[in-house]
């Protein structure tokens, strides 16, 4: 498909929707329950096109008179005499071969295209509401807005504190927010370790470290610090796509396809952006940040952390 979107030229976009009510088919003016179809030669009634798709809970008979196989899903087929019949998807392949397969592929492509057209048209019609949801996510997901979280993260590891304090936080706090302290092992612990290594001989004792690391604090959601660039990408995604969304009528097909592809990630990206804002708010809480004081011994460093954490009390 090239040029202008072909779906908008269709007489009725609804024809591509999956039919689940058999009454919709029976009410069609050209529908017949059974027709004698000629599969070879030039004479007789031929398959014209596939014009609809259905799926029912109960099985129905194929409309090809010589077939009659029961099936639950299939297609509405138009015939060369203007009539329409129901045709099982397997029946069509068995009776019409490549011709049916090609028409089936074409119909499916048109149906997918129609669904995409409707999705983009709905996105265009709901654009203002979508913008408001996006802005609400940035501003009101928690106590702190997106920008305030961004500034808080910068203040924590980007320059809001002294160089020494910042480097200590970066070096001593793991990416998951764990803070460990190195402490001496007891003689009993070292003896147990040697025993576990299977070497208790005083002459050939293997090296056993005299110290161990113990967890002294955990900064909740600290990994947001190192993932915040992803939040910025999500924000950029919404700002850009809100500028790009427009009425698909008359839209060049290459632009249409590109926008539809980007739009598929909209809901998932919104959830991810909201998650970043929620977790950023949990990170920047006084009782969470105050745990960083365990990294420092000097009163001025501890005071600096307390003052920083106090801004989020």
What are these regions (language model features)?
Residues 14, 34, 46, 59-61, ...:
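Context-gated lysine
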Residues 153-225:
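Charged linear interaction tracts used for macromolecular binding and regulation
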Residues 5, 30, 38, 49, ...:
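Detector for Asparagine
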Residues 115-146, 206-313:
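Extended, amphipathic alpha-helical scaffolds
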Residues 8-9, 14-20, 80, 86-184:
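Domain-exit/linker segments immediately C-terminal to small folded modules
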Residues 1-71, 76-77, 83-86, 91-101, ...:
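N-terminal cysteine/histidine-rich coordination modules
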């Amino acid at each position: 498909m090239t040029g202008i979107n072909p779906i908008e030229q269709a007489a009725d976009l609804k024809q591509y929707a999956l039919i689940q009510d058999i009454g919709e088919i029976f009410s069609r003016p050209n529908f017949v329950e059974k027709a004698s179809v000629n599969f070879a030669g030039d004479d007789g009634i031929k398959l014209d096109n596939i014009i609809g798709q259905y799926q029912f809970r109960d099985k129905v008979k194929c409309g090809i008179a010589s077939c009659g196989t029961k099936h639950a899903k299939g297609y509405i087929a138009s015939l060369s005499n203007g009539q329409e019949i129901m045709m099982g998807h397997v029946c069509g392949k068995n009776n019409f071969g490549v011709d049916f397969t090609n028409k089936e592929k074409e119909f499916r492509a048109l149906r997918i295209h129609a669904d995409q057209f409707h999705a983009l048209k709905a996105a265009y019609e709901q654009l203002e509401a979508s913008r408001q949801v996006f802005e609400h996510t940035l501003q009101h997901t928690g106590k702190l807005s997106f920008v305030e979280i961004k500034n808080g993260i910068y203040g924590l590891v980007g320059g809001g504190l002294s160089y020494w304090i910042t480097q200590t936080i970066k070096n001593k706090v793991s990416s998951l927010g764990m803070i460990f302290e190195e402490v001496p092992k007891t003689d009993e612990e070292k003896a147990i370790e040697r025993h576990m290594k299977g070497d208790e001989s005083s002459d050939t004792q293997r090296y056993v470290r005299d110290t161990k690391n113990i967890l002294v604090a955990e900064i909740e959601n600290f990994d947001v610090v190192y993932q915040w660039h992803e939040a910025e990408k999500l924000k950029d995604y919404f700002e850009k796509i809100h500028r790009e969304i427009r009425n698909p009528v008359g839209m060049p097909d290459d632009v249409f396809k590109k926008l539809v592809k980007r739009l598929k990630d909209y809901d998932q990206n919104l959830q991810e952006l909201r998650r970043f804002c929620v977790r950023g708010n949990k990170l920047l809480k006084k009782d969470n940040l105050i745990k960083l004081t365990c990294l420092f011994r000097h009163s001025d460093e501890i005071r600096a952390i307390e003052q920083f954490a106090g801004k989020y009390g």
